[in-house]
Amino acid sequence: MKVKLLVLLCTFTATYADTICIGYHANNSTDTVDTVLEKNVTVTHSVNLLEDSHNGKLCLLKGIAPLQLGNCSVAGWILGNPECELLISKESWSYIVETPNPENGTCYPGYFADYEELREQLSSVSSFERFEIFPKESSWPNHTVTGVSASCSHNGESSFYRNLLWLTGKNGLYPNLSKSYANNKEKEVLVLWGVHHPPNIGDQRALYHTENAYVSVVSSHYSRRFTPEIAKRPKVRDQEGRINYYWTLLEPGDTIIFEANGNLIAPRFAFALSRGFGSGIITSNAPMDKCDAKCQTPQGAINSSLPFQNVHPVTIGECPKYVRSTKLRMVTGLRNIPSIQSRGLFGAIAGFIEGGWTGMVDGWYGYHHQNEQGSGYAADQKSTQNAINGITNKVNSVIEKMNTQFTAVGKEFNKLERRMENLNKKVDDGFLDIWTYNAELLVLLENERTLDFHDSNVKNLYEKVKSQLKNNAKEIGNGCFEFYHKCNDECMESVKNGTYDYPKYSEESKLNREKIDGVKLESMGVYQILAIYSTVASSLVLLVSLGAISFWMCSNGSLQCRICI
């Protein structure tokens, strides 16, 4: 019995053995990513796919300055409001900037027909040629061309639009007029004009010397006849009369004809348009700065090569796609706080590793060994490099596929098109929701795949070592093996590089394994004896206890004992 107890004590004595473990890199990163199954997973490395910053400035776009309308609206600029005179010389731009509530629009009150459509057309124009379609001095010899209004005053004096002429009677007459222009510019030409609606018949007679005036405008694609509406109206800018403004695009080779016997606000300058689909109109109060950018938003410029942004849905230039997400981060490294249990959609399990190694800094996966010569970490460069190449290619592919940069400007609707505008917003919101969902789902799936990919690589490295060692070592958990033989540094290196010589160490391993197995058998015998003794002893204690209780109860009358023969 003394021998058996001695053997039992020996089995609990710690013995030194050479070991090798498979593990992965860890660091002090606090980056977190989301996956399909988990949120806020801490990882060693990740890349951001969502741009959320801007410089708060208006910048040149690829070296070309924007057209800043300042206190002028698009209407004031294109009609030639006298207060917008500084804009007349501007003929090219990268984009157009309008403030939210510009003061100088149509100085003479009235209705601007299809104004939102005109803005839409101008949003795709990057330059134009302003030219005199009907020269002021020679086109209207029988009419007065100096009509002005106090509502369009400039420097304290009555004035009028720079691109229009207010024709009135001359020498008490207003002869019928007919004027045409043939477009020979090889570009679309924007032509603007107006029709005056006096507040009373007296003004009508004084200005045009007729009570039954008309204005006719005809081209291949446009035909309309206007009749002045003479009526008293509420004063706007101290005017009871109104001017309604109209426009059309004249195709190359087409001719536009103006006929009237009164009330015509004639075109003086027209615009030969050059389209540029990278242009647009934005509404912004951001200040102009000496900066250059590839992407401009109303809030500021974005200088980013990322595929997504959440700064603003309206963009001009080469811009990331707008999404409503607040976080789109793609993992490139490994879990920094790994889970022990099995996980993953794609079958990879590395749960046998409880923690990463901060001591291994030269690779993602590798080894830690311990023997009589010491201990140390070593990265598996081949598997690490293969993983880096694969993940880098995947990230680049995702960015390339999703990084379709473009301009996204708002659509224009007038007050009578509110239902259409609301419907358009709902459609745009629907597309935006789809884009956001697709972007988030893509990142979640790829993050799940990447983490499972790392798990799989660690598992493969473990299996590679296991297949080499076979029964020359035993698995002791936590990704480690304990050798049945002495394994010096040269031996450890052969395991790492896949050249481990199994037969060389098999005999030593067999002897040590048999010794250990013998100890296990002796231990089993001891355990069996102890188990029998324990069972018998506990049974005797139970019987003695029951007997004592029964005797006591019989002696005090609590229990009657009858013996029948």
Curated annotation (Swiss-Prot):
Pfam families: Hemagglutinin. The record marks R343, G344 as: Cleavage. Residues 18-528 are extracellular. One of its GO terms (molecular function) is host cell surface receptor binding. Residues 550-565 are cytoplasmic. Disulfide bonds join C21-C480, C59-C291, C72-C84, C107-C152, C295-C319, C487-C491. Glycans are attached at N27, N28, N40, N71, N104, N142, N176, N303, N497. It is found in: Virion membrane; Host apical cell membrane. GO terms for cellular component: host cell plasma membrane; membrane; viral envelope; virion membrane. It comes from the Viruses. Residues 1-17 form the signal peptide. The chain crosses the membrane at residues 529-549. Keywords: Clathrin- and caveolin-independent endocytosis of virus by host, Clathrin-mediated endocytosis of virus by host, Disulfide bond, Fusion of virus membrane with host endosomal membrane, Fusion of virus membrane with host membrane, Glycoprotein, Hemagglutinin, Host cell membrane, Host membrane, Host-virus interaction, Lipoprotein, Membrane, Palmitate, Signal, Transmembrane, Transmembrane helix, Viral attachment to host cell, Viral envelope protein, Viral penetration into host cytoplasm, Virion, Virus endocytosis by host, Virus entry into host cell. Palmitoylated. In natural infection, inactive HA is matured into HA1 and HA2 outside the cell by one or more trypsin-like, arginine-specific endoprotease secreted by the bronchial epithelial cells. One identified protease that may be involved in this process is secreted in lungs by club cells. The keyword DNA-binding does not apply. Its main location: virion. HAMAP family: INFV_HEMA (MF_04072). Homotrimer of disulfide-linked HA1-HA2. Interacts with human CACNA1C. This is Hemagglutinin. It comes from Influenza A virus (strain A/USA:Texas/UR06-0195/2007 H1N1).
